[in-house]
Amino acid sequence: MSLNAKNKRSLDYCLQWPDFCQSKKASKLIVKLNKKHPKRRHYKDPEAKHYDVLFKGVCKAVTNGITNQLICDHIDLKIAPGEFVVILGKSGSGKTSLLSLISALDRPTSGVSFVCGRSTICCNDAQLTSLRNKNVGYIFQQYGLLRDLNVDDNIKLAVPFKKRHNNNLEELLERLELKEHRNKKITKLSGGQQQRVAIARALIKEPRILFGDEPTGAVNVDISKKILQFFVEYNRDKGTTIVLVTHNEKIVELAKRVIKIHDGKIVADYLNQRPKTINEINWV
């Protein structure tokens, strides 16, 4: 039996109805959060100018079409210029999701969120990109380097063409022990050398804040110690705000401030009264 056009459309709607209901149910949490904490297009907060990161009641909800999950749950956070912060959490704790929000890689679902004085919840994609380009350096867990380019070219990709004579390049190559490798392709470098290239690329534009997602997770202890020593010295010498995310409790001992996260919530936030030096930490 053939179906006319009207009956065929009706059948299509019936077949699509379960998916529609599922999607509608899955978005309830996001709708509820937005009603509770409505977005304000031109929201300002007098505190924002004093902090590199200012979060008040920030939530991030995600859905896979079936279940809802708060991956960041009512986060209150202030990070002042020049701080050295380590965010500690186990796998799945929400630390990388939080890092995406405070680095302006992602927007919250609700709450008040400022990064470098800008309300990220009010920014469109182009505005978020501009905010990151001007203020944020980010070291990705998987480095994100272009394998067919050499060290110099990978680093220079992070800055506009007209600024690629940046004197900061020579300083970074020197401090990160990359000068003798500058013309080598990424495929010819060790894992530790590739990590240092990723760090140089994140810092070449002299960002206001440097974020690192498990910056020593893929290298051995000796390389980790060198990289962490670089972060400590760079924070001290340049005054750049540094925020590192890790599951390694040893790294916490270096930080001036420690934030612990569990199930998308900040469960501890304290100052380290006496950060240890690299050599004082028992790395075994």
Swiss-Prot record:
- Protein name (database record): Putative ABC transporter ATP-binding protein MG468.1 homolog
Locate the transmembrane regions by residue number.
Answer: none
Residues reported in the UniProt entry to bind ATP: 89-96
Q: Which UniProt keywords apply?
A: ATP-binding, Nucleotide-binding, Transport
Top-level taxon in the UniProt lineage: Bacteria
Q: Which family does it belong to?
A: Belongs to the ABC transporter superfamily.
**Residue limits of the ABC transporter domain?**
53-284
Q: Does the keyword Nucleotide-binding apply?
A: yes
Note the PANTHER family from the entry.
ABC TRANSPORTER ATP-BINDING PROTEIN MG467-RELATED, LIPOPROTEIN-RELEASING SYSTEM ATP-BINDING PROTEIN LOLD
Task: Extract the Gene3D superfamilies matched here.
Answer: P-loop containing nucleotide triphosphate hydrolases
**SMART domains from the xrefs?**
AAA (SM00382)
Task: Name any one GO molecular function.
Answer: ATP hydrolysis activity
